[in-house]
């Protein structure tokens, strides 16, 4: 007997075929686009180095929803629960503060061995890993400067931390057979009017050059750098601005990270992708949702998320763009946050793959902007949801909101016991 889902799928195939779209091919392409989930949603960016310490660096996780992960075992269990509810290929993005060691480890001394449990777990779950040095929430970042610090000793500490992090990243790539993208973000900046804006940037330039001086196998490791407009306590001046890092990535041919929340509220990173791709070899995207500032709300299936996905698909950037998520909401169930945000990113990618782009390009080239707008709007109403539900079924994940019951059961049986 044909199920309702299968009936909807057959009808959707016909509707999309009528506008020249092969839905089976769209699903094959969707399986080429892993989304890198960020570990820090699971514990509000606490990490395991000093989990009781305060979060610094001009970022905030607001809320106090019960059940956050308190150690690596709990975090991995929570991730597994979330990943079971998300269809298709996934990766995990780790920060250096999520190391595991029986004794304290200085950040400039981190080694691959401190992340071996993560690698074994990734192998067991068929995941790639990405990495980040953690240049915040540390006594030597307390005055707001790290890689651009005027004190040579402190600056060298952070240089050494980033160099050690690159070796960890390369270890991930070598062990897992897929390159690890290591993103450098620093909180460096000033609260008020800054007289010398040049010297910190000169120091940052030299520091970054030292960080990436060790040649690593690009099949194992990819360097990325990330700008930001401002942070809490660094409202007036950010050393690592967009112009600084675009210039750096272009001149050094590293990847450039574009974070959806790291620009002026009227700017969108979807418009920056095609411009940056002319100059840099690869892009890392941190898909987020800024609400009036870099608030890192859970990603929605909104216009900007869709526009980001459409840029990747329309310009066939599958092999040059790495899709990561960056949000942390402590006011709702953290597993649900992962599931909602990651499923929304994948839905946006699917909708982009179901767009009749070739026809739209023809209309645009012919100057028929009326038809272009009409078709763009009409295709939003095509039955993409039926295609999504079949994709979920094929990946043995819940198709609709029934995933929430899985989360509620896990919350009742596991999270509620954490206090």
From Swiss-Prot:
EC nos: 5.3.1.14
Keyword terms, alphabetized: Cytoplasm, Isomerase, Manganese, Metal-binding, Rhamnose metabolism
InterPro entries found in the cross-reference section: L-rhamnose_isomerase (IPR050337), Rhamnose_isomerase (IPR009308), Xyl_isomerase-like_sf (IPR036237)
GO terms (BP aspect): L-lyxose metabolic process; rhamnose catabolic process
Function of the molecule: Catalyzes the interconversion of L-rhamnose and L-rhamnulose.
Subunit structure as annotated in this protein's UniProt entry: Homotetramer.
Family stated for the protein in its record: Belongs to the rhamnose isomerase family.
PANTHER family in alphabetical order: L-RHAMNOSE ISOMERASE (PTHR30268:SF0)
Protein name per Swiss-Prot or TrEMBL: L-rhamnose isomerase
Species assigned in the record: Escherichia coli O1:K1 / APEC
């Amino acid at each position: 007997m044909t199920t309702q889902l299968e009936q909807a799928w057959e009808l959707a195939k016909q509707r999309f075929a009528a506008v020249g779209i092969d839905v089976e091919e769209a699903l094959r392409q969707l399986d080429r686009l892993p989304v890198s989930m960020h570990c820090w949603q699971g514990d509000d960016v606490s990490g395991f180095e000093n989990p009781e310490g305060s979060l610094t660096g001009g970022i905030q996780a607001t809320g106090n929803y019960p059940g956050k992960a308190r150690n690596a075992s709990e975090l991995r269990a929570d991730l597994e629960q979330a990943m079971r509810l998300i269809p298709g290929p996934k990766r995990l993005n780790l920060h250096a503060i999520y190391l595991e060691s029986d004794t304290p480890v200085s950040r400039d001394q981190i080694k691959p061995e401190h992340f071996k449990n993560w690698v074994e777990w990734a192998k067991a779950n068929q995941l790639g890993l990405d990495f980040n040095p953690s240049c915040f929430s540390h006594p030597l970042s307390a005055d707001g400067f790290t890689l651009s610090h005027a004190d040579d000793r402190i600056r060298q500490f952070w240089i050494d931390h980033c160099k050690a992090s690159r070796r960890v990243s390369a270890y991930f790539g070598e062990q897992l057979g897929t390159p690890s993208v290591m993103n450098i973000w620093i909180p460096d900046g000033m609260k008020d009017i800054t007289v010398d804006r040049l010297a910190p940037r000169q120091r940052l330039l030299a520091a970054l050059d030292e960080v990436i001086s060790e040649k690593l196998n690009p099949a194992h490791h990819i360097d990325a750098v990330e700008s930001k407009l401002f942070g809490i306590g660094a409202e007036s001046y950010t050393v690592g601005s967009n112009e600084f890092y675009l210039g750096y990535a272009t001149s050094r041919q590293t990847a450039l990270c574009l974070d959806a929340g790291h620009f002026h509220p009227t700017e969108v990173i979807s418009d920056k992708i095609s411009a940056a791709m002319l100059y840099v070899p690869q892009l890392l995207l941190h898909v987020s949702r800024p609400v009036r500032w870099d608030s890192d709300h859970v990603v929605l299936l909104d216009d900007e998320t869709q526009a980001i996905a459409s840029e990747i698909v329309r310009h066939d950037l599958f092999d040059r763009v790495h899709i990561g998520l960056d949000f942390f909401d402590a006011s709702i169930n953290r597993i649900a946050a992962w599931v909602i945000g990651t499923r929304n990113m994948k839905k946006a990618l699917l909708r982009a793959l179901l767009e009749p782009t070739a026809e739209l390009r023809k209309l645009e080239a012919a100057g028929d902007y009326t038809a272009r707008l009409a078709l763009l709007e009409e295709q939003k109403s095509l039955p993409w949801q039926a295609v999504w539900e079949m994709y979920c079924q094929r990946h043995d994940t819940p198709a609709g909101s029934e995933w929430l019951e899985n989360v509620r059961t896990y919350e009742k049986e596991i999270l509620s016991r954490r206090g």
